[in-house]
Each structure stands twice: as C-alpha cells, then as structure tokens.
C-alpha cells in the first residue's frame, strides 16, 4: 500500500491527535491486490471496518481509499487497513472475524501485528486454510506447540476443539505422532452404553459425530475411513480409555466439563511417551447430575505444574456469528448475578443460624408477628 501524501504508515497524515476538534485525513493507494479481496463482496468487510471506527468516514474510489475524521480513529483505521492488506498479500482470505479481531488486537496493543499473529496456517485442507482467528486462539495454538498437556477452557464458538484437532492432524501429517485419539464423555447415556440399542458404532456415534465431522473437514473424506480402520485415528468414548497407556499419540478430550474428577485423573494418567494431550471444555456448561466436574477441579490441582498449560478463551475469541459473542456475555453476566445472589442467601442463612445459636431459641419457635 502506498500513501499518496508521503505519510509514514500508521501515522496521522493530517490533523492533530491532541486536538479532538481537528480532523485528519489519510489517502491510501492499494496496488497489486483486487479490491474485492480487501473490502469483501458487496463491501461487507468495509462495513465491518466502519463499525469499528464510527468517527471515521471511509471513501473508496478505484484503488484509492480515503479515511477522514477523528485523528486517533483515522490513524487506527489506517493501521488496520495496512494489516489487512498484508494478510491479503500473504494469500489469506479475509472475513469479518479477521477484521474485528485485528481491530481489537490493535486497540489493546499497537505493538502487535495482526498479520503475523493471524497469518500462520495450521493446515490447508480441501483448499481451505485453518488458522487462528484471534489473539487468544493464536496463544492457545502456541501453547499446544510448547507444552505436553494443554487445557483449552472457554465458551462455545471459540474454536478450542477445532484448533486442537487441526494440531493433531498436523502432527500426524508431520509424522510427529503415529496416531490420533479423539474422545469425549457420553454423559447423556451416563457412559452406560451397553443399555442402548444397536451395535457399538450405533451407540456411540451420536456422541462422537461432531468429531467425525471436523475430521472430514480437515482431511480427505475418503482417507478418514481407512485411517479409522487401521487404528491410526481412533474416536471413542472416554470409558474406553481406561487401563491403557497411550504412546506416540496426540490425544484430544472434548467436552471435559462433563468428566468426573475420577475420570479426569484416569484420562490424564493415560499419557505415554512422545504423546501430547489437549483437554477442551466449558465450565459454564456442566451437564453432570449431582457430581463435581473434573475440569473445574483440575484447574486448581494442576495449575502450578510445569509442562501443563491452561489456555482461557473468552467471548472475544468467539468466531461464529457476532451475536453468539453477545449471547455468551449475557449468560456470563447472568451466571455471575445468580452466584452473587446465592452467596448472599448463604450468608443470610449463616447469620440467622448464628443468631439462633446465641439466643438458644430455634427460629421455628420464635413468636409470630401479629
């Protein structure tokens, strides 16, 4: 990208950032790139950019982009466009997720380069690149590279399981491991699969189908059944991990919030030589009836052990429809309010019990008000 006013990239070309009443204007020339790749079909990505900087007017004419308005936001928008252009030149296909995530990243730390953070592809499968789309996802992927056991904890839509499976496929393709093992607890059946009708495949398929679907997206669908038949890829309920030692394997445990503490301990102690484990889950979606979550407990038990990393993803890492992130935030706030009310009720009950013990008079026998 060339700046027709000879302003250094990222600088405010006109106006005064220290004077909020002044206006700034930046002129950017896009060379060697189709504008539709930068701005999106029907300028959808341009619309996303404008939402990030409401005090900036964006005008596009040919391959020229003009940004005008608040000096601080003009500078930020210019930096964002430059980063997006670099991604396009690197061969990356842009979506609204990259635009939003890049703007958020630059807003938190100007020293970050979204084109570097989001530019590293894990896999290219069926013409589609699988890569981190947020800073949190990028840090999660880096943690998988540098630790033997990684816990990816966060709400739905943060890519924690999908990215873990992509890293597993990458490790297999690079011959870093000999097999992939994907597992999750069949909590809806209480792991008592023998009581369900049909063959073993019929019984476990509904619980493991999301993992099969992801595999078919990442690999040749004709190759997946062969790898499954050969045992190179294994997809099984958590109960089938008991009593095994898993060497030379990349193991992914999904829906770990629905493991009991005993199941979590059993799973983690299956780790063998030259193996890697990724455990994913959302501690706000525990489906266990009247039982503690192994994922919730393990964050306290293993928090200070070397070579074990806890990656915590948030609503900012949700890469589904933008509304999903707002839904996650709303439920998080609701749960926090409910927990606060529960705590207040417990405190009030404890206070009443103390008062009762001091007075020696049970509350049931206190005189009633008339």
Question: Which ranges hold each PLM region?
Answer:
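Conserved helicase motor core of SF1/SF2 NTP-dependent helicases
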Residues: 68, 125-137, 146-253, 257-370
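Short glycine-/aliphatic-rich beta-strand segments at the starts of folded cytosolic domains
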Residues: 18-37
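N-terminal acidic, proline/glycine-rich, low-complexity intrinsically disordered segments
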Residues: 1-14
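A short linear hydrophobic-aromatic micro-motif
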Residues: 54-58, 310-311
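Short amphipathic alpha-helix segments
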Residues: 33-53
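P-loop NTP-binding catalytic core
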Residues: 108-132, 137-138
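Interdomain "pre-motor" coupling segment immediately N-terminal to P-loop NTPase/helicase cores
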Residues: 51, 58-117
């Amino acid at each position: 990208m060339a700046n027709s006013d000879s302003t250094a990239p990222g600088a405010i070309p006109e106006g005064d950032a220290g004077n909020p009443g002044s206006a700034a204007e930046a002129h950017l020339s896009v060379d060697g790139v189709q504008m539709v790749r930068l701005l999106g079909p029907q300028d959808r990505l341009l619309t996303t950019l404008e939402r990030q900087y409401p005090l900036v007017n964006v005008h596009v004419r040919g391959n020229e982009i003009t940004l005008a308005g608040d000096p601080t936001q003009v500078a930020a928008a210019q930096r964002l466009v430059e980063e997006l252009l670099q991604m396009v030149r690197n061969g990356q296909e842009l979506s609204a997720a990259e635009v939003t995530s890049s703007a958020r990243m630059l807003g938190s730390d100007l020293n970050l380069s979204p084109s570097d953070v989001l530019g590293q592809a894990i896999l290219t499968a069926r013409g589609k690149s699988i890569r981190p789309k947020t800073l949190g996802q990028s840090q999660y992927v880096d943690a998988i590279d540098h630790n033997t056991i990684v816990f990816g904890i966060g709400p739905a839509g943060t890519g924690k399981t999908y990215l873990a499976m992509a890293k597993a496929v990458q490790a297999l393709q690079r011959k870093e491991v000999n097999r992939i093992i994907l597992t999750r607890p069949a909590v809806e059946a209480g792991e008592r699969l023998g009581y369900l009708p049909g063959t073993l495949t019929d019984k476990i398929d509904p619980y493991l189908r999301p993992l099969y679907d992801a595999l078919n997206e990442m690999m040749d669908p004709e190759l997946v059944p062969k790898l499954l038949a050969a045992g190179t890829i294994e997809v099984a309920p958590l109960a089938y991990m008991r009593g095994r030692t898993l060497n030379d394997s990349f193991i992914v445990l999904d829906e770990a919030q629905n493991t009991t503490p005993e199941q979590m301990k059993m799973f983690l102690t299956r780790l063998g030589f030259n193996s890697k484990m990724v455990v994913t889950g959302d501690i706000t979606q525990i489906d266990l009836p009247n039982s503690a979550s192994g994922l919730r407990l393990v964050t306290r038990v293993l928090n200070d052990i070397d070579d074990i990393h806890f990656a915590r993803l948030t609503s900012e890492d949700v890469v589904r429809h933008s509304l999903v992130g707002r839904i996650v935030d709303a439920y998080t706030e609701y749960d926090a309010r409910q927990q606060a009310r529960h705590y207040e009720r417990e405190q009030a009950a404890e206070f009443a019990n103390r008062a009762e013990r001091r007075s020696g008079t049970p509350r049931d026998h206190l005189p009633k008000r008339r």
